[in-house]
A protein has these predicted regions:
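Short amphipathic alpha-helices in soluble, non-transmembrane regions
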Residues: 97-100, 124-134
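RNA-recognition motif
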Residues: 107-113, 141-143
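Conserved alpha/beta-hydrolase "nucleophile elbow" surrounding the catalytic nucleophile
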Residues: 41-43, 109, 120
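Acyltransferase
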Residues: 85, 132-185
Length: 185
């Protein structure tokens, strides 16, 4: 079991497994007559949302997320970075990050009082300590790399080549874009 759990923490395995779970749940709900009025997913989940909305075939989405995980695993920088969820007003997170030496950024803004920071391990640790001292809740995320940061930027070009081959169609349902919370045009 421990070996299986460790394997699932590896992004090359996790990403296709998450998409397959999304698709399985969508199909199970459909079998019970439950169909979505719109679809949305965060980060990797946006692929599942596009599949659920019939804008992207499952096989293409699987190819994309497999490439995404594979490319992020293929390169191995000395520091794969850290990520942490921070429960604090965004302006406070920004204020603290400006005081930290090293590379640490807001990687995701999930609400006006919760974001994810990511970057170089030491800088993220220092930011976490400062945020905790300021009275905010901070939780390290169990991820293999500091996603949504420049640490994984070298994976973007090979992934872009895969994405260009996909068969993307107009979704049959409205899909919320995870970059801005708006419906796709």
């Amino acid at each position: 079991v421990a070996r299986a759990e460790e394997a699932l923490r590896q992004t090359a395995i996790t990403q296709p497994a998450v998409l397959a779970t999304d698709e399985g749940l969508t199909r199970m709900l459909a079998a019970y007559g439950i169909k979505p009025d719109f679809a949305m997913g965060h980060s990797l989940g946006e692929y599942g949302a596009l599949v659920a909305a019939e804008g992207l075939p499952f096989a293409d989405a699987l190819e994309a997320v497999s490439a995404r995980g594979r490319e992020m695993t293929r390169f191995s920088p000395d520091d794969k970075g850290l990520m942490a969820a921070v429960f604090a007003p965004i302006h406070e997170i920004e204020r603290v990050l400006k005081t930290i030496s090293g590379y640490v950024v807001i990687a995701n803004i999930n609400s006006n009082r919760q974001a994810v920071i990511g970057g170089a391990s030491d800088a993220v640790r220092r930011a976490m300590e400062s945020l905790v001292r300021a009275g905010y809740e901070v939780t390290v995320l169990p991820v293999s790399h500091a996603f949504h940061t420049s640490i994984v930027a070298s994976a973007s070009e090979p992934l872009r080549r895969v994405l260009q081959r996909l068969h993307v169609a107009e979704p049959r349902l409205p899909v919320v874009a995870n970059t801005n919370g708006e419906f796709y045009p």
